[in-house]
Swiss-Prot record:
The keyword Amino-acid biosynthesis does not apply. Signal peptide: none annotated. Belongs to the cationic peptide 04 (cupiennin) family. 06 subfamily. Keywords: Secreted, Toxin. This is Cupiennin-6f. Its main location: secreted. One of its GO terms (cellular component) is extracellular region. It is found in: Secreted. One of its GO terms (molecular function) is toxin activity. Expressed by the venom gland.
Amino acid sequence: FLNPFRWMINKYREWKNKKN
């Protein structure tokens, strides 16, 4: 990945999407 921070945000967004 490019940046860990960006990856974290992406993961968080994906998790939120999956949860919803």
